[in-house]
From Swiss-Prot:
Presence of keyword Oxidoreductase: yes
Key words of the record: Oxidoreductase, Peroxidase
Function: May constitute a glutathione peroxidase-like protective system against oxidative stresses.
CDD domains listed in its UniProt record: GSH_Peroxidase (cd00340)
Family: Belongs to the glutathione peroxidase family.
BP terms from Gene Ontology: response to oxidative stress
Substrates-to-products reaction catalysed: 2 glutathione + H2O2 = glutathione disulfide + 2 H2O
InterPro entries registered for this protein in UniProt: Glutathione_peroxidase, GPX_AS, GPX_CS, Thioredoxin-like_sf, Thioredoxin_domain
Protein name as catalogued: Glutathione peroxidase 1
Metal-binding found in the keyword field: no
Residues annotated as catalytic: C41
Source organism of the structure: Helianthus annuus
Classification of source organism: Eukaryota, Viridiplantae, Streptophyta, Embryophyta, Tracheophyta
GO molecular function: glutathione peroxidase activity
Length: 167
């Protein structure tokens, strides 16, 4: 009987903000920070500012941020994908990819988020708690840590450096 291999981030295909399929295997070999984002949250300004700082500092070293808009928390991401991308790219000058708006909890939760949450039930209580929850994924496509919404993206920098082999 063949042994089924362990799932990785690279086993998933998601939609970008324009509705095109993106095979996450394109991020193979990179350290990835995955964040559920919202435009009208109290955490928005600081989170995007710090995510941009980290992205610009490490993108050439094998680091990527994947942002997934989500409207499940306080209806704080009500816009269309086009409006969200325009907001993020205009106001914050973000260069990292913004994907299709998704659910991160419940029966319609995106499969990639079901995968990310596996193994972090004790920390998360089984569900994402709010906007700007963060998952750090290693170069092998395995989630290695998760961070609360209130955890500053800059606080995650040392963990990113370790996974990139910079420490």
């Amino acid at each position: 009987m063949a042994t089924q291999s362990k799932k990785t981030l690279y086993d998933f295909t998601v939609k970008d903000a324009k509705g095109n399929d993106v095979d996450l295997s394109v991020y193979k070999g990179k350290v990835v920070l995955i964040v559920n984002v919202a435009s009208k949250c109290g955490l928005t300004n600081n989170s995007y500012d710090e995510l941009n700082q980290i992205y610009l500092k490490y993108k050439e070293k094998g680091f990527e941020i994947l942002a997934f808009p989500c409207n499940q928390f306080g209806q704080q991401e009500p816009g269309t994908n086009e409006e969200i991308v325009d907001f993020v790219c205009t106001k914050f000058k973000s260069e990292f990819p913004i994907f299709d708006k998704i659910d991160v909890n419940g029966e319609n939760a995106a499969p990639v988020y079901e995968f990310l949450k596996t193994g972090f039930y004790g920390i998360l209580g089984g569900d994402i708690q709010w906007n700007f929850s963060k998952f750090l994924v290693d170069k092998n496509g395995q989630p290695v840590d998760c961070y609360y919404p209130t955890t500053s993206p800059l606080t995650v920098e040392r963990d990113i450096q370790k996974l990139l082999g910079l420490l």
